[in-house]
Amino acid sequence: MKLSISALFCVATAVMPVLGETFTNPVLWEDLADLDIFRVDDTFYYSASNMHYSPAAPILSSKDLVNWEYIGHSVPSLDFGSKYDMANGETAYVKGIYASTMRYRASNKTWYWYGCIEYTGTYVYTAPSAAGPWTQAAKISQCYYDAGLLIDEDDDTMYVAYGNTELSVAKLSSDGLSQSQAQVVYNTPSSIGTLEGSRMYKKDGAYYIFVTRPANGQYVLKSTSGPFGPYEIKELLLNLGSPIPNGGVPHQGGLVDTPNGDWFYMAFIDSYPGGRVPTLAPITWGSDGFPALELVNNAWGVSYTAPLPLTPVSHTGTDNFSGTELGPQWEWNHNPDTTKFSVSDGLTLNTATVTDDLYHARNTLSHRILGPTSSGTFVLDISSMADGDRAGVAALRDSSAWIGVLKDGDTTTLSMYSGLTMTSSWATSSTGSEVASADFSGTKVWLRIYADINVGTGKQAEFYYSTDGEAFTKMGSLEMGNQWEFFIGYRYAVFNFATKALGGSVVVEEFTVDAPGKTTEG
């Protein structure tokens, strides 16, 4: 019997913590970029970007800084224009949620999220709990680019550090929903170049702005004269060795302390084709009041002593789509049409779009790929597909492939399509072509993607099908691109779109993640 994802989490919380353990980087090999990290009492919170995926701004929680569990999203829907609904032939690829910030304000027991959307202004979402419900509370006209929120521990004043190269600090109104004042606090010298990705802190009476030089450096600004400076600067790291073979330099992210008073830096590493993944290292504070990173052989360590007793959380297992809502680990490609899906002992996907282009097919549901290698297996009941429908699973990015079922009249075919590509402006350049097919006459199919997202070129996603859930046949493979410009890494995705008329449906009965996940043909 396979445990559900939720059951696995329950098992994890029952494991007895062990003192003196070590952890290995990355702490979670999943695409969770532009992170903000903070602690409330004995729980750590992690907020990330996810661009055009919905719901947006995923939130994770942890008791030990190493094992993380998805708990929700700060932005329930991308309500920033019709293109986020794929309306009128438009899309919002590589737009939406960039680096943003989240904090808890104890004085009014409210959680806050701030993010600038397409440079048009900063949206503010609030909630009574980290898990929600989150609602939009305000829009501030100023774009707080790469915002970092500080709630001053001494007087409860809210500040936001933001900007690119020209770094600013804004003081917010008492309710945090508008701006009281703002000023530039630091102009980056040409000798450093670009600084962005602000996070703002206060420690021992000094104010700090933690900024990145993308994508190979991290700097710290410090002021003992107040939040508006003046600030002095010090390099924390530059061109540092990565704990992931062939991975980028750890950078951006944020600082966090434990209840014991120890400090840590959670950065992310460019790790394509899988995306940008989190990595953790200890921090000490020097006599000059600046933080210093604990290195191993002059590089970011592959492993360190655990910050706290570890309580493992599993990211493998089976989701049976029980209940009436999707778990927070799932995100749609753009906003879904909520009238075209339902969750009740399975996920029913009604066709929501008439198209021949997966990149324009609404209600495509995605799941991050667990690295360095894993497989994702979807079980589909296809008995209610209609003529012209296409249902299947994809390795989804700006260069994609999929395996699925084609329903044409009374004929049902298993097929693999490859060569789905986008232009540099993220418009579809090719809808792909069929590279393999097989006759099929059943009503249930198992579709599996095995993905190797170790960093580098030539990494493969392999596509399999089964008619009984036991013997799997390989239909083809995709060489995944490892360019960074799309930002988001490859994801598993399940879809059902029409090429003729709406009305058909499929039921996704379950989804299983296995790691390392290598499949042999049966």
Task: Report each predicted region and the residues it spans.
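Fungal secretory targeting signals
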Residues: 1-21
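Carbohydrate-active catalytic/glycan-binding domains of CAZyme proteins
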Residues: 18-522
